[in-house]
Every structure is written in C-alpha cells, then in structure tokens.
Design a protein with these regions (language model features):
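Right-handed parallel beta-helix/beta-spiral solenoid domain characteristic of secreted/periplasmic
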Residues: 32-39, 71-138
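Right-handed parallel beta-helix/beta-solenoid
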Residues: 14-17, 21-46
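Post-signal peptide N-terminal regions of Sec-secreted extracellular proteins
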Residues: 25-32, 46, 50, 151, ...
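Bacterial N-terminal signal peptides that target proteins for export
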Residues: 1-9
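Right-handed parallel beta-helix
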Residues: 77, 122-136, 148-163, 171-186, ...
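Extracellular beta-strand/beta-solenoid scaffold signature
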Residues: 90-119, 136-143, 159-166, 182-195, ...
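N-terminal extracellular ligand-recognition/capping segment immediately after the signal peptide
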Residues: 38-43, 50-73, 77-84
Length: 363
C-alpha cells in the first residue's frame, strides 16, 4: 500500500494540485448544514466554510467524501448500525483522493501538493470527523494526507481494504474513542511524519493485520487503547527512510491475544502472528505500564514486548535508547519479553513477567 501511495502522489496529484481558497472563518457565522438520506454529503461539504458543521442524519449513505477546506466538522449521528453508515457507492467519484489513494470513505486532503514528489505544500487545517461508521471500502475508511490538526473521534472502521483510520504526512492529529475492526492492513496508522505530534488514545483495534501501526514517524503517544485479535498488536517501524521512527510513548494499553496469522505479502515481506508490542528499529521510545498477555506465535514478531533491529527487515535502524518499564507481560510466546541484543541504551526496568530472551529481563 505505501509503495502505491508514494508513486500515486506524484502521478495523480499533479492532475489538480490545489483546492480553492476558502473564505476566512471570521467572515462567516458558523453554520450547521444538515444532510438527510438521499442527499449528497459531498455537496454539503463543498458548501461549507471554515467553522461550519456538516451534520449527517441517521441512515446508510452509499457515498465517498473528500474534504479540502479548513475548519470543517463532519458529524454523523453515531458510529454504529442505526447511526450514520458510509458504504461504497456503485461508482466512486473521480476525486483526487480516490484516484491517488484508492476508493476511500472520508478523505481529508492537503490544499496543495507538489506534483512531482507528492510533498505537501499547504496543509488542510483543523478538520474533525466524528460519529460515523465507515465500512467495506476497497481502499480506506478515514484517510488524511497533508493535514494539520485533524481530529477523528467516535468513528468505527470495519472491513476496509487497506487502512481503517489513517494519516500520512500530517501533524497534530488526534485519534480518540474510535474502533477499527477487520481492516486488511492497519486499524490505526500514523506514518511519514518526522514531526507527527499525534495522539492515539482510548481506541479499540480488533482483527486487523496491525492494530496500531507507527511507521517513519516521531512524537507519537499511544495510550489507553485495547488491542486484540490482530496479527501484530502495536508496531513502531523504521522502514529505512531518512529520519527513522521513534520518540513514541506506548503507555497504559491493554494488548492481548493478537494471534491472527498474516502471510507475507508485497508490503509485509515476512509472516506475522502472535505479536503484542513490537519496536522494530525504533529509537528514543518508551513502553511503560502496559498489560500484554496471551500473544503467541512462532514468527519473527511473536511475543509480548519485542525489541528488534530493523536492519534485516527494512534496512532501518537498530533500536537505540528505548526504555521498557513497569509492564505486566504473561503467557506470551516466544517469550514475554524479547530483545535481539542490538542497539545501545536499551533498558528493561521493573517489568513483571515470567519468560524473557535473553534471560534476566523480568523483574
């Protein structure tokens, strides 16, 4: 998926680089634009100005939505069946998002992008998506690219083809009180952001390939999430790009029975199963006060809390200056705690567990 994204940005976003300039919010009184079943959500979004709310009444909407205006709130009437449900239309609109990133439920896209490189020139700022169920999209559920200050809250993404709830090349993101179930790649994804300044909290991730996936990003907080039934619960990956991955705080999460099997693929060159929390080449990261239980498998990622070099997998870094502290880890296989011995400044402190590789990491 990521390879496709990077190539598509240069090839497709050049078709139409910039969104129209929105009128300043101060020139408008904030409005609520109501959408009812049978009406177009996109038409309401196109009418909205900074500060406006697009309120979607309960119902099933066969629609795909693109947002490129600052300060819009897209508010559904509940992230459950019987609330506001977005499902794929028979024919997807020819938006830049759908062309570049695959058919997507809700896409929040930068105002301006470099046509040659896909680099963000001008972010879209301070948008909110809340109260929706987004399901069965061949691409992504909710997808942000080139956003600043994006909030996604009380959204459920089920059985989407790539990512459930994700953001690329963005900063100041909040994913809170969301649910991601059965998405083909990651339930929650934070990537390609050296200054992510992102919080993923109080979310639930079940039955995805990766529950919560942090790749090529720094300054991320992952806290108070419940993660179960995935091939890998929480992953921080240095994929070899400049800047690496790290400065991630994974704190007070419940990570249990992530025992789904995922075969290797073009995007994932090794099979995965039974992984709780994995730091793969991450640096300057902290894993603390988590409950990690019942994650079992025989793959490279298998175990409760696992710290490995990314050099062999993705030509990334060794796991330098990471701290694994005061976690509870039990009934995990290949071990409750695993470290391949690479890197410098890696510390295991006060962890309550029974098995570790190498021996002696448990308190």
């Amino acid at each position: 998926m990521r390879k496709f994204l990077m190539a598509a940005c240069a090839a497709v976003l050049g078709i139409g680089l910039s969104a129209g300039t929105a009128t300043a919010a101060s020139a408008w009184a904030s409005r609520t634009i109501v959408v009812r079943p049978g009406q177009s959500i996109q038409a309401a979004v196109n009418r909205a100005s900074p500060g406006d709310t697009v309120l979607i009444k309960p119902g099933v909407y066969h629609q795909s939505v693109q947002i490129r205006t600052d300060g819009i709130t897209l508010r559904g009437s509940g992230d459950f069946y019987g609330g506001t449900v977005l499902v794929p239309p028979k024919s997807f609109p020819k938006t830049l998002c759908n062309a570049a990133f695959g058919p997507t439920g809700v896409c929040i896209l930068a105002k301006s992008v470099n046509p040659k490189t896909g680099a963000v020139i001008r972010s879209v700022r301070d948008d909110t998506v809340t109260g929706l169920l987004v399901t069965r999209f061949p691409g992504n559920g909710v997808f942000g690219y080139g956003t600043d200050g994006l909030t996604v809250t009380r959204v459920t993404a089920i059985n989407d083809g790539d990512y459930g709830i994700s953001r690329f090349v963005s900063t100041r993101t909040l994913f809170a009180d969301d649910v991601a179930i059965g998405n083909h790649e990651a339930g929650f994804y934070v990537g390609d952001s050296p200054d992510a300044d992102t919080v993923v909290r109080d979310d639930q991730a079940y039955g995805n390939q990766f529950g919560i996936f942090i790749r090529h990003a720094r300054e991320v907080q992952v806290t108070r999430n419940r993660v179960s039934g995935n091939c890998q619960g929480i992953l921080v990956l240095d994929d070899g790009q400049r800047g690496g991955a790290g400065n991630v705080a994974i704190v007070s999460n419940t990570v249990f029975r992530n025992n789904k099997f995922c075969a290797k693929s073009e995007d994932t060159p090794v099979a995965t199963q039974g992984g709780g929390i994995l730091l793969l080449g991450a640096t300057f990261s902290r894993v603390a006060h988590n409950s990690v239980t019942g994650n079992s498998g025989s793959q490279f990622n298998s175990g409760g809390i696992v710290v490995l070099s990314a050099k062999m997998i993705s030509q990334g870094s060794n796991p330098n200056f990471d701290t694994i502290a005061f976690n509870s880890a039990f009934r995990n296989h290949r071990a409750d705690l695993r470290w391949d011995g690479t890197g410098i400044g890696v510390r295991f402190v006060g962890n309550v567990c029974r098995t570790s590789v190498p021996p002696g990491l448990c308190h």
